[in-house]
A protein has these predicted regions:
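Beta-rich catalytic cores
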Residues: 26-28, 78, 103-105, 126, ...
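Long hydrophobic segments that form regular secondary structure
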Residues: 86-122, 136
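Beta-propeller and related beta-repeat scaffolds in trafficking/envelope systems
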Residues: 9, 73-75, 145-158, 162
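Beta-propeller blade signature
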Residues: 80-87, 130-138
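Short glycine/acidic-enriched loop and turn motifs that connect beta-strands
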Residues: 46-49, 122-126
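Surface loop/turn motifs at the tips and blade-to-blade linkers of beta-strand repeat domains
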Residues: 20-22, 96-100, 144-150
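Blade-terminus and WD-like Trp-Asp/Gly-His loop motifs, strongest in beta-propeller folds
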Residues: 24, 29-38, 106-116, 157-166
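Predominantly five- to eight-bladed beta-propeller fold
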Residues: 2-30, 41-94
């Protein structure tokens, strides 16, 4: 077991919150390093997100009520952080970034099992940083920033080449 702090409607580890599933089509919120020594995973702190209740009809005479965190426009979103888990050391480390990104819609390991790429975005989703984070030194650098007047579309086409370049 990698984490022990998960709690319904408070902390989610390695799975997505409602916003990430709907906005970014992200369900599995972890990635194994190519050498199998590390896992990078998302931690969603939903504790400040307001709850929403919905009636579910499951075949009975009366509905059951499901209560879950559901941020409406302009309200608090989950605070998202990325962690490295080192299997040999049995230790998780928070990946420090220069900015507190509102969204981190994608993570992907490079061919180097110590380097993780991540996309960091602002709330309006019109500014994206492409960041490389080092699992061993817990340092990172922004390789480039993309800005748009309206919206930046997220894709899964990032491919790392053997020489650490990418397309």
């Amino acid at each position: 077991q990698v984490t022990t702090d998960g709690k319904k409607n408070h902390i989610i580890n390695g799975a997505s919150d409602w916003v990430y599933e709907e906005e970014f089509a992200l369900v599995r919120s972890f990635e194994w390093a190519p050498d199998g020594e590390h896992i990078a995973y998302y931690k969603f702190d939903e504790s400040q997100v307001k709850e929403f209740s919905m009636d579910l009809f499951k075949g009975g005479l009366y509905p059951t009520q499901e209560v879950f965190k559901y941020p409406k426009a302009g309200e608090e979103n989950s605070v998202v952080r990325i962690y490295f888990y080192n299997l040999k050391k049995d230790k998780s480390t928070y990946i420090y970034t220069e900015k507190d990104y509102e969204y981190i819609p994608r993570i992907k390991w490079t061919k180097n099992s110590n380097i993780l790429a991540l996309y960091g975005m602002n709330r309006h989703q019109n500014e994206l940083d492409f960041v490389l984070a080092d699992a061993t030194s817990n340092t990172n650098k922004v390789l480039f920033t993309e800005k748009d007047n309206y919206y930046i579309d997220i894709h899964d086409n990032l491919t790392f080449l053997p020489d650490d370049n990418f397309i």
